[in-house]
Amino acid sequence: MRYLKSLAVAATVSLSLPVTASAQQALTYKDQEKLHDIAAAVQADRIEKDIQKLVSFGTRHTLSETESDTRGIGAARRWIYEEFKRISADCGGCLEVMYVTDIIEGETRIPDATEVKSVIAIQRGKTDPGRYVLMSGDIDSRVSDVMDYTSDAPGANDNASGVAGTLEAARVLSQYEFDGSVVYAALAGEEQGLFGGKILAEKAKEQNWRIHAVLNNDMIGNIEGINGVINNTTARIFAEGTRMDESDREATMRRFYGGEVDSPSRNVARYIDLMADRYIPNLDTMIVYRLDRFGRGGHHRPFNDLGYPGVRIMETNENYYRQHQDLRTENGIEYGDTIDGVDFDYAAKLTALNAVSLAGMAWAPEPPQNVDIEGAVQPSTTLKWDAASQGEDVAGYKIYWRLTSEPQWQWSRFVGDVTEYTLENIVIDNYIFGVASVSEDGFESPVVFPGPAGEFSIDFEEEGDQ
């Protein structure tokens, strides 16, 4: 009798399994050989040479010399400009190289009128040039006194490493053509108040750039932490939660529908984390649920402030003896951001991560817009979204979902070229959902969480109505 009862229980369990198992489909992703090629093309020796050149300018302080050809931020930015020009010449003029500039004055760290002049290079997309992904590093450097613009400030890791990585990404990616545009930016004025980023973000807003990801690289070369940890196999991705430009109405919606951990920036971070797992050997990325390091800032923030998705990519282990320090030795400790503190292979690894992430997003279609979700007091969940713009290379869409307590997507389903789909017997209350666009070649956009909390597109014309 006990045996028969066991059979009955087993039969009941087996009958219930197909409903659950069929609903929960493991994550699927098409491996892209071109992204493996891009990762392999990044060269540490070129990054080393670029860092050496940037260090050779003595100081790159925002208030430093601008007329000398050998010292100061003026010489540094002119060299970066010419380097972008050389890269463009190697790809048949595929880069539009320009300065982005404004006069800043009356600020705590820029009291007198100063031209804050950044250098950018734009690789225009072939089918959707108005859609952008952006990689940045910071030109300027500093010592202990943020207003000291004459002392040597090599800034080898902070942040010649980020600029060198951006130049190297441009060398590699300029050998390919993408659907969307890629921007490579060397930004000035970071240490004095994030002014280079503010100027470029405002330019993007004025010109209606559809920026879907800003990858700010600020210190990507240090592997020896001040805590004694030495590790070249991990990196951090900082990503804000709730968008800075969220309206009161949107905040109320988020309270009832969720989305505080699924901002566009967080889903860009998840995208980059997936790229690390698939294409960068021996690198594990840590997504940090914070705008930046505790109480600190970086050049992705001005873009976040306007509503653009943006993250900071950087080393895991910082060494504060090598940040914002006068060059000196005290009590046997060597202070200063010198080139001997940079691991060039590690910087190349993080540069490759940027390159494959930029390429994957630029080859993918635009992220879905106006994603909506329904399913309250229902056994199933329905998602809806707008069809991609005409001319987009779209094979269809993929729905992702995960338990509400999980940081990463757990399940996915390609649903074809439709704008509405119902996940049968998946209860809306128990999961977080999102939708990605998929190209004919299998490249995917970042995942979009339903509603305003997860929306990638920005309509600046509606700002006054918020």
Annotate each predicted stretch with a short phrase.
Residues 38, 46-124:
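A non-catalytic alpha/beta surface segment that caps or lines the substrate-entry region
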Residues 55, 220-241, 287-363:
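Active-site-adjacent mobile loop/cap segments within catalytic or ligand-binding domains
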Residues 423-445:
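Beta-strand-rich modules
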